UniProtKB/Swiss-Prot annotation:
Xref: InterPro entries: Adeno_PVIII
Organism of origin: Human adenovirus A serotype 12 (HAdV-12)
Quaternary structure, from the entry: Interacts with the peripentonal hexons as well as the hexons in the facets. Part of a complex composed of the core-capsid bridging protein, the endosome lysis protein VI and the hexon-linking protein VIII; these interactions bridge the virus core to the capsid.
Protein name: Pre-hexon-linking protein VIII
GO molecular function terms listed in the Swiss-Prot or TrEMBL record: hexon binding
Induction: Expressed in the late phase of the viral replicative cycle.
Residue positions assigned to the propeptide: 112-163
A Pfam cross-reference name: Adeno_PVIII
Misc: All late proteins expressed from the major late promoter are produced by alternative splicing and alternative polyadenylation of the same gene giving rise to non-overlapping ORFs. A leader sequence is present in the N-terminus of all these mRNAs and is recognized by the viral shutoff protein to provide expression although conventional translation via ribosome scanning from the cap has been shut off in the host cell.
Residue(s) carrying Phosphoserine: 180
Protein family: Belongs to the adenoviridae hexon-linking protein family.
Keyword Phosphoprotein attached: yes
Annotated Gene Ontology cellular component terms: host cell nucleus; viral capsid
Gene (name only): L4
Length: 233
C-alpha cells in the first residue's frame, strides 16, 4: 500500500470527563489487498485517498478553532448549551368551587369584592371562601408562548346570580413551564459535540519528523486524565 495515504486516527471518548481519551489507527477498516493486482491496488488507494479528503473537509467544517486540541476544561463559549424543551402541565381544576361560584354568585374580575346585604341586617354577609389551588415551582419560569387559545380559564357560560346551575363544557387548560439555567455550563463536552469536534484525524507522514513533535494523544498508552504517556518523560 502507498505510505502517502495514511490510515486515519479514530478518537475515543471519555464520558465521565467529557474529553477525548486519545486516538489510534483503526487497521480493521483496511481492505484486503494482499492477493490483488496493481489495478486493484490502485483503485483501493483511490478509495482511501478520497476517504481522507472527506475527513479533512469534515474537520474543517465542524471543528471549533481553538489553541489546544483537547483542552482539559472547555470554556462555556465553546460548549453546546442544551436548552431543555418546555414542560406542559395540566392545570388543576376545582369543579366544586366552580359550581359554588355559579350558584352563589361571584365577581370574576375587576373592582372590589362582592358583599351581599340583606334586609334587617346591618353588616353585609362576607363572600364565601373559594378554595384556591397554588402551583409552586422550583427553578422554573413561565414561558412567553401561549400554547392554547383557551388560556387558563374554563370555557363556558356562568350564571353570576340565582339558583340555577350553569352548563359549561369543561375543557382542560394547560400551562407551559420552561426551565432556565442560572449560568452557562463549562467543563466537558457531550457526545454530540465530541463527534463533531473530533472527527477521525488524518496525520500525514507521522514518523518522518522529530519524535518530540509526534502528538501524545496518538500514542496507545496515552492517559487523558494526567495528559501524559505512561513510560515517557
Amino acid at each position: 500500500m502507498s505510505k502517502d495515504i495514511p490510515t486515519p486516527y479514530m478518537w475515543s471518548f471519555q464520558p465521565q470527563m467529557g474529553l477525548a481519551a486519545g486516538a489510534a489507527q483503526d487497521y480493521s477498516s483496511k481492505m484486503n489487498w494482499l492477493s490483488a493486482g496493481p489495478h486493484m491496488i490502485s483503485r483501493v488507494n483511490g478509495v482511501r485517498a478520497r476517504r481522507n479528503q472527506i475527513l479533512l473537509e469534515q474537520a474543517a467544517l465542524t471543528a471549533t478553532p481553538r489553541n489546544q486540541l483537547n483542552p482539559p476544561s472547555w470554556p462555556a463559549a465553546l460548549i453546546y448549551q442544551e436548552n431543555p424543551p418546555p414542560t406542559t402541565v395540566l392545570l388543576p381544576r376545582d369543579a366544586q368551587a366552580e359550581v359554588h361560584m355559579t350558584n352563589a354568585g361571584a365577581q370574576l374580575a375587576g373592582g372590589a369584592r362582592h358583599s351581599f346585604r340583606y334586609k334587617g341586617r346591618t353588616e353585609p354577609y362576607p363572600s364565601p371562601a373559594i378554595k384556591r389551588v397554588l402551583i409552586r415551582g422550583k427553578g422554573i419560569q413561565l414561558n412567553d408562548e401561549v400554547t392554547s387559545p383557551l388560556g387558563v380559564r374554563p370555557d363556558g357560560v356562568f350564571q353570576l346570580g340565582g339558583s340555577g346551575r350553569s352548563s359549561f363544557t369543561a375543557r382542560q387548560a394547560y400551562l407551559t413551564l420552561q426551565s432556565s439555567s442560572s449560568a452557562p455550563r463549562s467543563g466537558g463536552i457531550g457526545t454530540l459535540q465530541f463527534v463533531e469536534e473530533f472527527t477521525p484525524s488524518v496525520y500525514f507522514n507521522p514518523f518522518s519528523g522529530s519524535p518530540g513533535h509526534y502528538p501524545d494523544a496518538f500514542i496507545p498508552n496515552f492517559d487523558a486524565v494526567s495528559e501524559s504517556v505512561d513510560g515517557y518523560d
